[in-house]
Amino acid sequence: FGLLPPGPLVKADTAADGNLSTVLAFDVNDLYDLVDGRIEYKDYLVQYESAALPDREIVIDAARYQAVHGEGFEVLDGFEGQEGASLLTGEQGRVDWTVDIPESGLYHVSILYYPIEGKSSSIERMLLIDGEVPFQEAAYLQFDRIWDNQYDEVKRDNRGNDLRPQQIEKPEWREMLFKDYEGYYEQPFQFYFS
């Protein structure tokens, strides 16, 4: 599987050995080709209604990629208190991973991420499996930034009225399941991996 910033696209292919290789393409027009004609999540679930629900966790170490293409990638040890190595990604580029899926079935996917201060909008990514967006909603995955009041105490104006505190980003490590941010589906997405 793969994640990507808005614009460039991740493509994944299953190798002959059953491993999943993920790559990122740069042509934004590919986005429309990847999403065009994709089924909705509800239809995707019907398609895989008899699939197994493996009771296992598969961990992909982001810093153990096969290759990176582009700039802005850096492996950082102990970044912001997180043990081990983390992968800092830029806005564009490509990262290739190989993932072994020992048991075919429907899996939830989560990501441990640190939303580095930047734009005020949520982080958006896309997931592709075997080179395709599995369903429409997988093209628009959102990961929240963390906001807090700038000051611990509430300030008041000259009449004693509370003033709305200014919000600032306070990044921290978060684990987030891939889910529908439009609210149509309450449960996290399930993805079929083979």
Segment roles from a protein language model:
Residues 2-9:
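C-terminal segment of classical bacterial N-terminal signal peptides
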Residues 13-194:
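Extracytoplasmic
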